[in-house]
Amino acid sequence: MKRTICLILLAISLLCPATAATRRALIVFIGDYPESTGWNKLASANDRTIILKMLKDNAFLPENIICLQDREATHDAIVNALDRLLSLAETGDRIYVHFSCHGQQITDQDGDEALINPRDIYDEAIVPADACIAYGWNGYKGENHIIDDVLNRYFNAMTSKIGKRGCLLVVNDACHSGGLERQGADSDTLHFRGTFDAFVQPFEGSPEKPGIQPVTWVSISACKDFQTNFEASIDGKRYGRLSYAMARSFHAGMTAVQLTEALTRTYKSMPLPTGKAQTLASFIPEKLKNKKLFGQ
């Protein structure tokens, strides 16, 4: 009898994974920038409410959610949170990362962007609470902007740790406002994220050899790189357009393709300023297109 029980337990242990996959999240919402930074206020607090509810409704446990808001979301705090998320990640984990804040282009110091587009001299960056709007603003030189090269290294490291059974979804409601939309935009009446002006630094170069980092995760951004990321007014409240669409569209059993299709439908139903356009931007690695993002 004891031998039979032992054999049953052994069979169960072989059939079940050693550790259950965990749903983890890092969510960053910055709307109340210090006046000293030069950035205008955003409605990111409203985004926080609906994204936290979305995660709760999709079985993310509070202890597995790292949330930074407003002035606590400094450069160091965001980097420390990324370090923590990376250290916690295990094989098979499903990870959700969300940025709801300002975004800005910044001088590309290592030349990697030009490998894709020879005319591109800027990196993309998210703007923490302690980053200023322009070079020299209150003595600021750009040290607190977090560029896409840095984020990509974290995300590639995460996908390496979680492996083929895991999945990483990165949602960026922090796009810069593209230059082609500059004409006719009125910042007094239209609420948008980012700025038309790039953060231009003196070019110093980088000791790192430029290279293109592969994208091994699902990436969704609020707009194309030449468009403006407008906030949406819904029932008298402002929201980030992508944050609102995510909260309305996302459920854990979706594939990446199903999610982008649902987001596009929601986008079309949302109001936009007269004469303006905003199109969802996404990148899905071929092997992840039909994979359930947060399913089993």
Where in the sequence are the language-model features?
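Cysteine endopeptidase catalytic domains of the caspase/legumain-like
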Residues: 16-296
